[in-house]
Amino acid sequence: MGVVLLPPPLSMLMLVLMLLPAASASEAEHRLFQYLFEDYNEIIRPVANVSHPVIIQFEVSMSQLVKVDEVNQIMETNLWLKQIWNDYKLKWKPSDYQGVEFMRVPAEKIWKPDIVLYNNADGDFQVDDKTKALLKYTGEVTWIPPAIFKSSCKIDVTYFPFDYQNCTMKFGSWSYDKAKIDLVLIGSSMNLKDYWESGEWAIIKAPGYKHEIKYNCCEEIYQDITYSLYIRRLPLFYTINLIIPCLLISFLTVLVFYLPSDCGEKVTLCISVLLSLTVFLLVITETIPSTSLVIPLIGEYLLFTMIFVTLSIVITVFVLNVHYRTPTTHTMPTWVKAVFLNLLPRVMFMTRPTSGEGDTPKTRTFYGAELSNLNCFSRADSKSCKEGYPCQDGTCGYCHHRRVKISNFSANLTRSSSSESVNAVLSLSALSPEIKEAIQSVKYIAENMKAQNVAKEIQDDWKYVAMVIDRIFLWVFILVCILGTAGLFLQPLMARDDT
């Protein structure tokens, strides 16, 4: 099917006919604008009777909660202020203007209520009037200007980062009292239909209230509409980046008391934990308000943990001092033995390995028998070597039996700590001076070994006392860490239940 082409004159005629309604409507709006603002004064209140107030319907719509500055205690919000009133000077008949019922005009051309934010902290108190207002043929004026407000807000950081805040926004006319402007609240709360969710704060509720206040400066009564914005901080960021690392560091503090004293790294671990906590404390000081009225919850926890670590350093130094004590420097009191070696280990379910001493009586009996045999041997009947007639090659029965006895006795004596056995040997007058000197040396070695064993036992007792002290503070710090953490972080929950 081919395309039908109209003659050029006919095409021009149809184009003119299509543009006539648009041109006619534009002409109607132009005439309407001239009619409305020919004698209009944007300074005069739009009331027929000067004693009547202008009724202003007011509503705030929250678009975005931009930021809550805890340091400067400022809340920054993006709001739409909906204001509706009736201006009797801006009425017309739609039939006179080709059915035009609505018209948008610049806001600076008409009278507007001077609604301001009373608790503004920064920036302009009034909204920008560069937006247009919507006029209806009945005289109803609707003006919804957007604005970014920075309002002052008293922020209580006691339970930071699990805190709830109540920030108020007070709107009202700055120059018109109740007799000139009557504010009417639309709805019972802030409009949150177009609210863009914040990544740090959640809005619980935002009720609005109308107040009538008489200020000291004036005799008139002024109205205001105040919105109470109840917000809750989302603690996920602070939980992951602050609280959990602090919990882990506190757990490392507990492990200090489980680390053996011989390792030599106990104090190093304590100081490393203390430095880590100091870094965390420097980090959070930039995120909380600089106020001396209250200490935030996370600050209390870090302070608690820092005291915790400091005490662990002091206790660790004391434990190391006890661990390395010797009999030459310290004498263990009786009460220390009774408490730390007998009582507390049983209470703490600690078992200490005991050294085997069951062979001591048997060994002493054996050594006594050896000495008895040696004394009997000194009174033997052989007279060749005993009576001063020594053999030439030492192969006689007396010499051979004597060498065997002395060899066996010397070998056994080195494992004995009995002074009685050695003294019995020294009393043998039949032995030669060389044998007596050897036995005297063996006696010295035995006594020295006995003294070393006693000293080692005392050192082991001091080490065990240090181990008991470590175990006591291990459980004490575990309980304090658990109870302190639970007590601190359950406070916001209990405070919320009370309210």
From Swiss-Prot:
The lineage of its organism: Eukaryota, Metazoa, Chordata, Craniata, Vertebrata. The chain crosses the membrane at residues 245-260, 263-279, 302-320, 469-487. Activated by a myriad of ligands such as acetylcholine, cytisine, nicotine, choline and epibatidine. The heteropentamer CHRNA3:CHRNB2 activity is blocked by alpha-conotoxins ImI, ImII, PnIA, GID and MII. The heteropentamer CHRNA3:CHRNB4 activity is blocked by the alpha-conotoxin ImI and AuIB. It holds the Pfam family Neur_chan_LBD. It comes from Rattus norvegicus. It is found in: Synaptic cell membrane; Cell membrane; Endoplasmic reticulum; Golgi apparatus. Expressed in neurons. Expressed in umbrella cells of urothelium (at protein level). The keyword Cell inner membrane does not apply. NCBIfam families: LIC. Coiled coil: none annotated. Neuronal AChR is composed of two different types of subunits: alpha and beta. CHRNA3/Alpha-3 subunit can be combined to CHRNB2/beta-2 or CHRNB4/beta-4 to give rise to functional receptors. Part of a complex composed of STUB1/CHIP, VCP/p97, CHRNA3, and UBXN2A that modulates the ubiquitination and endoplasmic reticulum-associated degradation (ERAD) of CHRNA3. Within the complex UBXN2A acts as a scaffold protein required for the interaction of CHRNA3 with VCP/p97, this interaction also inhibits CHRNA3 ubiquitination by STUB1/CHIP and subsequently ERAD. InterPro entries: Neur_chan_lig-bd (IPR006202), Neur_chan_lig-bd_sf (IPR036734), Neur_channel (IPR006201), Neuro-gated_channel_TM_sf (IPR036719), Neuro_actylchol_rec (IPR038050), Neurotrans-gated_channel_TM (IPR006029), Neurotransmitter_ion_chnl_CS (IPR018000), Nicotinic_acetylcholine_rcpt (IPR002394). Keywords: Cell membrane, Disulfide bond, Endoplasmic reticulum, Glycoprotein, Golgi apparatus, Ion channel, Ion transport, Ligand-gated ion channel, Membrane, Metal-binding, Phosphoprotein, Receptor, Signal, Sodium, Synapse, Transmembrane, Transmembrane helix, Transport, Ubl conjugation. Ubiquitinated; by STUB1/CHIP and thereafter degraded by the 26S proteosome complex. Disulfide bonds join C153-C167, C217-C218. Component of neuronal acetylcholine receptors (nAChRs) that function as pentameric, ligand-gated cation channels with high calcium permeability among other activities. nAChRs are excitatory neurotrasnmitter receptors formed by a collection of nAChR subunits known to mediate synaptic transmission in the nervous system and the neuromuscular junction. Each nAchR subunit confers differential attributes to channel properties, including activation, deactivation and desensitization kinetics, pH sensitivity, cation permeability, and binding to allosteric modulators. Residues 261-262, 321-468 are cytoplasmic. Na(+) binds at E265. This is Neuronal acetylcholine receptor subunit alpha-3. The keyword GTP-binding does not apply. PANTHER family: NEUROTRANSMITTER GATED ION CHANNEL. CDD domains: LGIC_ECD_nAChR_A3, LGIC_TM_nAChR. It comes from the Eukaryota.
